[in-house]
């Protein structure tokens, strides 16, 4: 059974849905995001695209541990828009996602429960349309070895489909690779069985400084 702290879920593809509730038009948008700047950019683009809309309500979650969770009712009564959207994101166990529901007012007030249901439905539909993909958290390692060992190293990399991030293949070789957290222990054991190979775990932020 997969350990839950080794995986995270995102939407497969950005999508759009539309529904009408008592004359009001609700358009749901989903986006993959990696930063708060992404959110600002997507919202700004939508405000230009849907410039006649009255409300741009949204919720988003960032980080694989879901540590950043933000909601915005954009003028709707408190907790009638952003929170219902967020609850749909959480119900699908998603992260790194922005859901925006744009509302064109149709002249009829929907009331608190009506608004909650409308924003909930739009968010749920756009998430379902986007689909969900499960991803594995990765760890990064630096492998140091002599060029005479390159055939053995590359054989292991090919056999276990290991992702090479960077490499410097000279007399003294360096390869930086990524491996899913769930497979990291097994992968390290395989490399350590080969004498002369030196392997060290890297912090993700240090990769750019290496090589």
Segments from the language model and where they lie:
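Short amphipathic alpha-helix segments
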Residues: 144-162
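Terminal, non-globular segments
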Residues: 177-186
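Structural motif
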Residues: 29, 58, 96-99, 140
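N-terminal positively charged helical leader segments and presequences
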Residues: 171-172
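Short glycine-/aliphatic-rich beta-strand segments at the starts of folded cytosolic domains
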Residues: 132-147
